[in-house]
């Protein structure tokens, strides 16, 4: 590498260090370096590193530092740094003598590392130096001289590190006060080292054979730059600057060094030998560094500069030739520092005009070579240092020069001309962004240009007139001239004007002569001559500039480009620039300097006069200028003759406005708008109103004369109409604009409105302008410019037209939809008075309503619009008008000034709901949301009116009072109590004996009642919406004042809406268009009702009860309405149940969390005190149903003592019963009911308490009944069973035929809960292992079985109910029994309860009753599908959910057996959509069906497909005929199942067009369920039976899987994984399988959404790939020609599916263990790796090992495994190939897993070594579960029977495939 610098060890850096000097500088010894005074003796000289003396561990690390790769060096430095940090010289075991050789070696190595190519290496080397220096302390002293040079190089390293580790190391080792001593101590050696570095070249700095030239060049530049910076660092730390004060006239700074003369000479030698040569280096980095050092030399080494001043002047002032912008910062620093240091002397020793100025001019012409931000701000400082001798040719200006002195101004021409030429480089909008950006480089040039111009005028222009003329008349004028004449501008517009105006003012402030010269400049005709401007604007010829005129004083302006076409300025650009110019002038007009204001006023006056003089010749430009000026200046600042000038100008402007109107055919908002603005501005300056009227009359006369003159000459009617419209628009615009400045009454004119033709819809905007000051008023306030009587005429005209339209449409019952025009008039000519569109009336009415004009006629118009709006929103035939009238809704249904009108409008809304069916608007056509919103809006607006009047009393809210009175007086509302239907499932607090009291009622079959229910629902919802919007507290407050029954009515009607009252079926007959529309409205109305009931009704009822408690407090129980409520609880018929429910709701609130505990206790006490329960003398006993219901409702708040008393009373009474049949069953029923309610209530409380305390409460913790009491109940079961047996006996039936009916009627309801609590008790006892189990006796068990059988089989003893099976109460009774019996059955089959409750016959009992439950479930589903269920759909929801839970608890064996009986029914439910049930139930039905079918399909013995062999009749006659081949037919077990699987026309095909159709989505989900069941069965059966199912999937050349994949794949979200943790199941080995349907996907959503179908499709797709990979591969191959489809398939499987399948395959392989049944004595091992995707299998037998490796591809199973046999000792090549074919066949055609393939290989090996050969036809040892047994007697080869038979069929001969022997 280059020269051998170590040869001979020459040079100062290898000289011995001065230990004597070091000794004087070292301090006391310490662990840290504290100075050189610590040395007490001389040290031995260190020469070449002695590696033999270095410790071996360091020697190894130092050798690592010599490695070529940087990674090794970095690791070596890290280890070395770690070693250095562990050095402890104070340790007794540390060898001090080892430091010297180590440091000698480190010196040698560090010098190499500081210029390493890797930045990290250089940084780590400095860290190592810091570490060892801080550890060895004073022992570093002898090595400082050799280390200082490279150390400073490292400090000055120009890397991108945020932390300078070399500098940190230096500062940590040496204290601040000792650092100067360090630099002195090692100064000479360090400088010598740096000088040697400067001698390097790219050829000597490295080996060019092994290192690229680029790296060498980079290394060379880094070495030179860092060395130069290191020299600068030494200079700055060893010298100081001082000012020589001996000569006051001297401008130079002398430098004295604190070092010796020898050091200065060393610097001089460095600079003389090679420093200036670096200025010519090709490396910009080296040149930049050299310029930086040059600045330091100028400031620090003044003596050296003085000695070589001529060279320095030439070099420094010649730096303008530098073209690299990255170096210009230091270049300018050096130049300015040199000129500051030496002033004029700097120019004396150099030929400026030959050596300096040409380079400077070239620098400026080139745009400073790109350094805009640095160079342009530096040109002015440079100009200040240029002496006069160079500028004007004389050493200094004369003290009093003559103004006419002739001097050379060539310097200024060159300076400013070259700056102009530099603009061609700088002005590049594409490169430098937005032309209007303030950061444009041209803006920097502009600032530089103007600053130099001002400075030149100030320094030289004031003394030499010639210079000043050139600067102002030529240069400054050209700026203005070009800016207002040329389109292109190189500068930002606003910044240019600001800078130019600022410079103009500064020039004017320099002297009075400058001010006069500038004023004359602006007053001259050449400054913005409008006549010339007009010619310039109309001239299409471009202007061409020539560079031949550049030497002329009137040279081309700065903006012109040489030899380029300059585009004249456009009108828009000129107007924009003039506007900006005037605004900037206005901003500068507020200065206190009179000269500033004089200059600006001269400019503005000149512009104003030009605009006024050219109004006729150049109207648009003149008007714009006038508008700009008047908007920024006061008129008295511009004109001098006052009012006369204003009148003259206004007249000129009015004529111009009229001329513009006639020429353009209308008001041009560009020119005309500006004209109006200027006229208004001038008109507002007239102080006298009489003068304003006079001027205004002149303006009107101008327009009227124009209309009349043109009217006489006009031939067409349309022209006259347009002229009137345009003229009126102009006047309206003018009046509206002047209204804010002038009294508008002075400008009003009745003639204006008379010229308008109202029926012409073109006049709409004109009318709006007349009524509203919409040009100057953002709020569009009503401010008409016509008299009030004219407004009244307009209102009456609109009213009459609207009435005519309404009467016509209502009487004729016209039909209009959205496609009709609705009476629109599209005629552009004058419209006929009788032909007015509804749209036009809407717009006119909106204008009038928004005006809030106080007029009775306007209120009448409002009422008429309200009528019409009600009609169109509730009549389908007028639905097309909704869109046309929507915009007027905000103005309707607002209060008028008359309360009677408001009540009339409100009555219209109420009556629209309460109309008879014979009217036009029927209850089936109501838009409830619209009507309620209108009523709310009307009442609220009335409240606001009272608030505005300062009256907050609710008594004055007459509209609300009127509404409530109408509500409470409605007969439907009053009679709603008779139609309330209560669902037992919602309010199951009491024993529903009212169901038995109402069994004879048949109200459901009365058509009039059904219609009343429908109508009542709509009336109630309308009223509820209004009441809720105003707050329930307001309703309560009103009701309390009126003291009426409104609260009770509201409670009952809220309960009615929350009950089971259903809407009648929607009519579906559609015969005409009108009927179709009506049907749509009916559905919409019903949806409104259902939506309100579902979302608001329950909350509203609870909120109302809460509001009642907040209003009344504990006084609520003393209210008459509450006492009435309590008195009706438990009464006869339906009313008893209704009031029981209401009381229960009040108690629910008291016991809820919404009621505070203190308030709850108070309310409980008050309620119990207010309710009197009639008891007998014996204590707490119950004798009536009313009393029973009261106690049952009050149980949550009764005291424990009362509850205990009721419990003991019931038990005592029941314990006294005997086997004799009692005479009164009612009392027994009451006793059973209250006891059951107490137990159930207590169980619920315990459950709630356990949930709050998060702990399990056992029976022992708080017993409900004692063990003795439970035994009493168990005995009671036996007693009731004895009664039942006796009652059903033939004797009793003959003697008392009604006894059985009475028994079942009175006891059955009570037994439901009674049996439930007993069964629950037995279950709890038997689940407690510490308790003795309880078994029911035969009689007790028979009692449970008999009742349960009756209930589940629906064989009710109440035969009279059969007459009214459509009756609601019968259905409620049936639902109650069905639900409770299911709960009992649930408990029986849970855990092991069945063996305790039904001992001995549990299995048969479960099968028999499970079949009954399945049949009941199917019947309920069927009834709900056919809409025959008269009960509430919510009841069905509860029951169906309980059915689902019951089936889930059944064992798979039971479900398998019962599903066999109803397979087709269950399958059909998967694909059925039920409109009559909720979507949730629809999904629940599917889920339950799937759960039952899963037990069938998941059974491994289930065979879905059967195969049949079909023989062709020609087979026996012609064996050579191909048609004689035998065929196999496959039959699926169910036609319905097959239809669902393949019915794509009903699922995914229509889904492409309608993705949100619930019917399609539901059927599609059922189809996906069926496919999932099919795959479930496929996964359970063995490989041999899969071939039959595969045969059906491919039967009749129909690829069923391919068809299915083509349907579902487009719906899959390709960016989402198909399998989540919630949709997978895990087998015993922990492998994930998607064999269960992912119900977690659908359970979270209420609807069956398209997104849900997407997820289900992706899940099913995964299952297909997992279980049927061969068919998926075939499908993928078929789509390989479709590049887009193929890419999607490959990407989706590779990204999401393959990783899961591969993971499962590997887990399955690793979890495999050999079974005990394996009789082979061979050792078989198998293992897999997920990371490498490899499976390795080894087979060891008789000391012989055979192994294979299976490689799984990333897109497995699309791509089959690759098999490699790593060891095959003892097995032939052909045998291996046979096994490979067998494994490939298994994977390709039989869908085997990786483990199956490995086990097949193992079995093949076992058979192979047992002497069994593979079949030569299929190359497999196993076929259909058999081994080759058919043997050829000749060749002795054995074949599979199936293979050889197939061979005979295909080859049409019976010869051996190998030896061709006839085998027949």
Swiss-Prot record:
Signal peptide: none annotated. A zinc finger (RING-type) spans 1815-1860. It is found in: Cytoplasm, Cytosol. Component of the ribosome quality control complex (RQC), composed of at least the E3 ubiquitin ligase rnf160/LTN1 and nemf. The complex probably also contains tcf25 as well as cdcD/CDC48 and its ubiquitin-binding cofactors. RQC forms a stable complex with 60S ribosomal subunits. One of its GO terms (biological process) is ribosome-associated ubiquitin-dependent protein catabolic process. Its EC number is 2.3.2.27. It comes from Dictyostelium discoideum. Pathway: Protein modification; protein ubiquitination. E3 ubiquitin-protein ligase. Component of the ribosome quality control complex (RQC), a ribosome-associated complex that mediates ubiquitination and extraction of incompletely synthesized nascent chains for proteasomal degradation. Ubiquitination leads to cdcD/CDC48 recruitment for extraction and degradation of the incomplete translation product. HEAT repeats lie at residues 100-138, 265-303, 349-377, 378-418, 598-635, 642-668, 669-694, 695-733, 800-847, 900-937, 1021-1060, 1080-1117, 1137-1176, 1185-1223, 1271-1308, 1312-1349, 1599-1636, 1662-1699. Keywords: Cytoplasm, Metal-binding, Repeat, Transferase, Ubl conjugation pathway, Zinc, Zinc-finger. The keyword Acetylation does not apply. Belongs to the LTN1 family. It is an enzyme of class 2 (transferase). Residues 1-25, 241-260 are annotated as: Disordered. GO terms for molecular function: ribosomal large subunit binding; ubiquitin protein ligase activity; zinc ion binding. The gene is rnf160. GO terms for cellular component: cytosol; RQC complex. Residues 15-25 have a biased composition (Polar residues). This is E3 ubiquitin-protein ligase listerin. Pfam families: Ltn1_1st (PF22958), LTN1_E3_ligase_6th (PF22999), UBC_like (PF23009), zf-RING_2 (PF13639). It catalyses: S-ubiquitinyl-[E2 ubiquitin-conjugating enzyme]-L-cysteine + [acceptor protein]-L-lysine = [E2 ubiquitin-conjugating enzyme]-L-cysteine + N(6)-ubiquitinyl-[acceptor protein]-L-lysine.
């Amino acid at each position: 590498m280059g020269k051998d610098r170590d040869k001979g060890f020459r040079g100062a850096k290898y000289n011995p260090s001065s230990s004597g000097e070091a000794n004087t500088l070292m301090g006391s010894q310490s662990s840290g370096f504290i100075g050189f005074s610590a040395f007490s003796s001389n040290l031995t000289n260190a020469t070449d590193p002695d590696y033999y003396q270095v410790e071996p561990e360091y020697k190894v690390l130092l050798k690592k530092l010599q490695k070529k790769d940087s990674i090794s060096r970095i690791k070596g430095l890290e280890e070395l740094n770690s070693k250095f940090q562990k050095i402890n010289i104070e340790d007794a075991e540390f060898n001090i003598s080892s430091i010297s050789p180590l440091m000698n070696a480190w010196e040698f190595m560090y010098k190499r590392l500081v210029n390493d190519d890797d930045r990290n290496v250089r940084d780590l080397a400095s860290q190592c130096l810091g570490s060892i220096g801080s550890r060895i302390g004073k022992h570093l002293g002898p090595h400082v001289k050799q280390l200082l040079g490279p150390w400073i190089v490292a400090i000055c390293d120009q890397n991108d590190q945020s932390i300078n580790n070399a500098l940190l190391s230096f500062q940590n080792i040496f204290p601040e006060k000792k650092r100067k001593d360090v630099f002195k101590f090692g100064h000479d050696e360090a400088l010598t080292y740096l000088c040697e570095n400067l001698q390097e070249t790219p050829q000597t700095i490295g080996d060019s054979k092994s290192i690229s030239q680029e790296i060498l060049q980079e290394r060379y530049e880094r070495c030179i730059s860092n060395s130069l910076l290191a020299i600068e660092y030494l200079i700055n730390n060893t010298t100081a600057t001082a000012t020589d004060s001996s000569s006051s006239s001297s401008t130079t700074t002398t430098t004295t060094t604190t070092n010796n003369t020898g050091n200065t000479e060393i610097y001089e030698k460095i600079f003389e030998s090679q420093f200036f040569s670096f200025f010519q280096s090709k490396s910009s980095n080296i040149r930049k560094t050299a310029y930086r050092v040059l600045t330091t030399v100028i400031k620090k080494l003044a003596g050296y500069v003085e000695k070589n001043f001529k060279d320095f002047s030439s070099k420094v002032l010649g730096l303008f030739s530098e073209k690299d912008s990255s170096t210009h910062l230091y270049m300018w620093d050096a130049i300015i520092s040199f000129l500051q240091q030496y002033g004029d002397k700097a120019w004396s020793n150099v030929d400026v005009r030959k050596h300096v100025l040409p380079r400077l001019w070239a620098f400026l012409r080139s745009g400073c070579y790109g350094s805009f931000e640095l160079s342009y701000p530096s040109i002015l400082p440079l100009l200040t240092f240029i002496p006069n001798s160079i500028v004007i040719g004389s050493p200094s200006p004369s003290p009093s020069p003559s103004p006419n002195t002739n001097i050379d101004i060539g310097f200024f021409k060159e300076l400013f001309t070259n700056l102009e030429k530099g603009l061609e480089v700088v002005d590049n909008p594409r490169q430098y962004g937005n032309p209007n950006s303030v950061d444009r480089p041209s803006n920097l040039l502009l600032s530089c240009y103007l600053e130099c111009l001002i400075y030149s005028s100030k320094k030289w222009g004031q003394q030499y007139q010639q210079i000043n003329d050139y600067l102002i008349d030529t240069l400054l004028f050209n700026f203005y001239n070009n800016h207002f004449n040329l389109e292109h501008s190189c500068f930002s517009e606003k910044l240019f004007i600001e800078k130019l105006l600022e410079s103009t003012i500064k020039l004017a402030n320099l002297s009075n002569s400058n001010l006069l010269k500038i004023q004359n400049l602006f007053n001259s005709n050449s400054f913005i001559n409008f006549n010339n401007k007009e010619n310039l604007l109309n001239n299409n010829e471009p202007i061409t500039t020539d560079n031949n005129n550049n030497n002329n004083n009137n040279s081309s302006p700065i903006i012109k480009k040489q030899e380029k076409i300059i585009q004249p300025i456009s009108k828009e650009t000129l107007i924009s620039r003039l506007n900006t110019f005037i605004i900037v002038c206005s901003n500068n007009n507020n200065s206190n300097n009179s000269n500033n204001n004089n200059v600006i006023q001269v400019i503005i006056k000149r512009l104003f006069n030009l605009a006024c003089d050219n109004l006729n010749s150049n109207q648009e430009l003149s008007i714009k200028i006038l508008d700009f000026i008047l908007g920024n200046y006061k008129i008295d600042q511009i004109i001098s003759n006052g009012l006369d000038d204003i009148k003259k100008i206004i007249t000129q402007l009015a004529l111009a406005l009229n001329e513009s109107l006639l020429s353009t055919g209308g008001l041009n908002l560009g020119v005309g708008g500006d004209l109006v603005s200027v006229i208004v501005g001038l008109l507002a300056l007239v102080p006298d109103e009489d003068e304003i009227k006079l001027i205004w009359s002149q303006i009107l006369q101008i327009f009227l004369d124009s209309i009349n003159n043109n009217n006489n000459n006009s031939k067409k009617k349309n022209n006259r109409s347009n002229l009137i419209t345009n003229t009126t628009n102009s006047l309206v615009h003018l009046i509206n604009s002047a209204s804010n400045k002038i009294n508008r009454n002075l400008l009003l004119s009745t003639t204006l409105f008379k010229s308008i033709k109202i029926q012409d819809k073109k006049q709409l905007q004109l009318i709006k302008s007349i009524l509203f000051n919409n040009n100057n008023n953002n709020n569009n306030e009503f401010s008409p410019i016509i008299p009030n009587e004219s407004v009244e005429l307009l209102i009456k005209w609109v009213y009459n037209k609207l009435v005519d339209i309404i009467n016509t449409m209502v009487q004729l019952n016209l039909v209009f939809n959205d496609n009709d025009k609705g009476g629109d008039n599209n005629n552009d000519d004058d419209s006929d008075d009788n032909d007015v569109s509804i749209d036009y009336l809407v717009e006119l009415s909106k204008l009038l309503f928004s005006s809030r004009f106080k007029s009775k006629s306007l209120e009448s118009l409002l009422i008429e619009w309200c009528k019409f709006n009600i009609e169109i929103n509730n009549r389908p035939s007028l639905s097309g008008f909704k869109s046309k009238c929507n915009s007027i809704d905000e103005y309707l249904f607002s209060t008028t000034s008359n309360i009677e009108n408001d009540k009339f409008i409100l009555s219209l809304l109420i009556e629209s709901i309460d109309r008879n069916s014979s009217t036009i608007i029927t209850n089936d056509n109501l838009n409830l949301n619209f009507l309620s919103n209108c009523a709310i809006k009307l009442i609220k607006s009335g409240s606001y009116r009272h608030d505005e009047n300062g009256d907050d009393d609710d008594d004055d809210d007459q509209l609300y009072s009127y509404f409530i009175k109408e509500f409470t007086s409605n007969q439907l509302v009053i009679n709603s109590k008779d139609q309330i239907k209560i669902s037992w499932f919602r309010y199951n607090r009491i024993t529903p004996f009212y169901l038995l009291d109402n069994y004879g009622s048949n109200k459901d079959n009365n058509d009039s009642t059904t219609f009343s229910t429908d109508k009542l629902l709509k009336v109630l919802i309308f009223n509820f919406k209004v009441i809720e919007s105003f707050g329930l507290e307001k309703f309560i407050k009103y009701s309390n004042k009126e003291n009426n029954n409104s609260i009770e009515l509201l409670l009952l009607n809220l309960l009615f809406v929350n009950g089971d009252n259903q809407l009648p079926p929607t009519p579906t007959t559609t015969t005409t268009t009108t009927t179709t529309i009506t049907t749509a409205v009916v559905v919409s109305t019903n949806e409104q009702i259902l939506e309100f009931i579902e979302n608001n009704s329950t909350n509203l009822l609870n909120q109302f009860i809460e509001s009642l408690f907040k209003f009344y407090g504990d006084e609520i129980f003393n209210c008459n309405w509450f006492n009435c409520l309590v008195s009706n609880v438990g009464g006869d018929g339906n009313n008893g149940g209704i009031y029981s429910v209401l009381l229960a709701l009040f108690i629910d609130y008291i016991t809820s969390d919404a009621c505070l505990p203190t308030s709850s206790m108070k309310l409980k006490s008050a309620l119990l005190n207010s309710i009197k329960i009639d008891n007998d003398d014996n204590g707490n006993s119950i004798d009536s149903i009313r009393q029973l219901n009261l106690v049952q409702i009050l149980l949550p708040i009764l005291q424990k003592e009362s509850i205990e008393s009721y419990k003991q009373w019931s038990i005592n009474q029941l314990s006294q019963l005997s086997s004799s049949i009692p005479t009164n069953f009612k009392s027994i029923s009451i006793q059973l009911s209250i006891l059951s309610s107490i137990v159930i209530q207590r169980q619920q409380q315990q459950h709630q308490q356990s949930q709050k305390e998060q702990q399990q409460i056992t029976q022992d913790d708080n017993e409900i009944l004692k063990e003795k009491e439970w035994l009493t109940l168990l005995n009671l079961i036996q007693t009731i069973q004895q009664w039942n047996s006796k009652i059903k006996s033939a004797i009793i039936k003959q003697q008392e035929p009604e006894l059985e009916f009475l028994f079942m009627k009175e006891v059955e309801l009570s037994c439901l809960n009674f049996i439930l609590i007993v069964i629950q008790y037995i279950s709890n006892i038997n689940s407690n292992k510490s308790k003795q189990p309880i078994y029911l006796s035969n009689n007790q068990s028979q009692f449970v079985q008999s009742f349960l059988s009756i209930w589940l089989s629906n064989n009710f003893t109440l035969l009279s109910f059969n007459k009214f099976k459509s009756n609601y109460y019968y259905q409620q009774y049936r639902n109650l029994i069905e639900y409770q019996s299911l709960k009992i059955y649930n408990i029986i089959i849970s855990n092991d309860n069945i063996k305790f409750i039904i001992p001995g016959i549990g299995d048969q009992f479960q099968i028999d009753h499970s079949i009954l439950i399945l049949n009941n479930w199917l019947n309920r589903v069927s009834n709900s599908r056919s809409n025959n269920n008269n009960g509430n759909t919510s009841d069905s929801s509860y029951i169906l959910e309980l059915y689902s839970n019951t089936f889930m608890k059944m064992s798979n064996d039971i479900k398998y057996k019962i599903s066999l009986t109803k397979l087709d029914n269950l399958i059909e439910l998967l694909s059925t959509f039920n409109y009559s049930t909720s979507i949730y139930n629809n999904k629940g039905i599917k889920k339950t069906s799937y759960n039952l079918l899963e037990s069938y399909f998941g059974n491994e013995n289930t065979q879905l497909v059967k195969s049949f062999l079909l023989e062709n009749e020609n087979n026996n006659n012609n064996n050579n005929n191909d048609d004689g081949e035998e065929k196999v037919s496959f039959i699926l077990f169910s036609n319905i199942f097959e239809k669902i699987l393949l019915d794509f026309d009903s699922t995914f095909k229509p889904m492409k067009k309608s993705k949100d159709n619930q019917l399609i989505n539901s059927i599609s989900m059922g189809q996906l369920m069926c496919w999932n069941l099919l795959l479930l069965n496929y996964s359970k059966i063995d490989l041999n039976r899969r071939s039959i199912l595969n045969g059906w999937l491919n039967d009749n050349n129909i690829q069923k899987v391919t068809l299915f994949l083509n349907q579902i794949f487009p719906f899959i979200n390709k960016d989402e994984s198909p399998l989540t943790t919630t949709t997978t199941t895990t087998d015993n080995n922990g492998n994930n399988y998607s064999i269960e349907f992912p119900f977690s996907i659908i359970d979270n959503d209420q609807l069956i959404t398209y997104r849900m179908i997407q997820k289900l499709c992706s899940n099913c797709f995964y299952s297909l790939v997992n279980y049927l990979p061969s068919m998926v591969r075939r499908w993928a191959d078929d789509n390989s020609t479709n590049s887009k489809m193929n890419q999607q398939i490959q990407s989706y499987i590779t990204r999401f599916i393959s990783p899961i399948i591969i993971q499962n395959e590997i887990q399955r392989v690793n979890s495999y263990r050999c079974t005990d049944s394996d009789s082979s004595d061979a050792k078989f091992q198998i293992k897999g790796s997920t990371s490498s995707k490899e499976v390795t299998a080894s087979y060891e037998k008789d000391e012989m090992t055979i192994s294979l490796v299976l490689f799984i591809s990333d897109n497995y199973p699309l791509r089959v495994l690759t098999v490699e046999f790593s060891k095959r000792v003892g097995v032939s090549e052909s045998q291996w190939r046979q096994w490979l074919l067998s494994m490939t066949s298994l994977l390709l055609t039989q869908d085997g897993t990786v483990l199956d393939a490995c086990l097949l290989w193992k079995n093949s090996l076992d058979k192979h070594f047992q002497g069994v050969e593979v079949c030569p036809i299929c190359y497999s040892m196993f076929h259909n579960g058999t081994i080759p047994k058919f043997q050829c007697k000749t060749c002795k080869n054995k074949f599979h029977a199936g293979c050889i038979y197939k061979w005979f069929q295909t080859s049409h001969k019976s010869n051996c495939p190998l030896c061709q022997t006839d085998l027949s």
